[in-house]
Regions:
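Active-/binding-site microenvironments in catalytic and ligand-binding cores
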Residues: 1-156
Length: 156
């Protein structure tokens, strides 16, 4: 991992993904840049978000983080993971056994996905999540989804 990598920010990003998928029915982000000061994620999205929607996502992420959920990782055969998750962001050499990160109870997690990154042990270690800004780039001609870029912070 990079010297400036922030496990709390990364774990908060997992919860942000879960909230966005649950609230809007979109796919998980397709691009992520995790930094200690401010991070950003990009979602394929059909429209811009209103300020009220952004605040609601921020509140929901904070509600999940404040539950003190365990963050754990378990191995899963690649074949099973391919049936349950989108593996397109994994490196080709990830192997036949993948590491699945769970936020919350692995039986009914708030979030679960293949991930090679470092994480906190409990969501309380993420601190407060702040939705700093977002911008929407409309879809290119012939496409139905644009890009919603979200910038956020986590920590105390």
């Amino acid at each position: 991992m990079a010297k400036s990598y922030d496990p709390a920010m990364h774990s908060a990003e997992h919860v942000l993904n879960a909230v966005m998928v649950r609230r809007f029915g979109c796919a998980r982000c397709f691009s992520t840049h995790i930094n200690p000061g401010k991070s950003k994620v990009d979602f394929r999205f059909p429209r811009d978000l209103s300020p009220e929607e952004a605040r609601a996502v921020e509140e929901e992420v904070n509600a999940e983080l404040s539950r003190g959920l365990a963050v754990s990782a378990r191995p899963m055969p690649r074949e099973e993971a391919a049936r349950r998750f989108n593996l397109s962001r994994l490196p080709a050499d990830a192997g036949e056994e993948l590491r699945i990160v769970y936020v919350g109870d692995p039986v009914a997690p708030v979030d679960a996905c293949p991930c090679i990154g470092e994480h906190v042990e409990n969501t309380l270690q993420c601190g407060h999540f702040t939705w700093c800004s977002h911008e929407f780039t409309p879809p290119a001609e012939g496409e139905n989804l644009g890009v919603l870029r979200v910038r956020f912070r986590a920590g105390n």
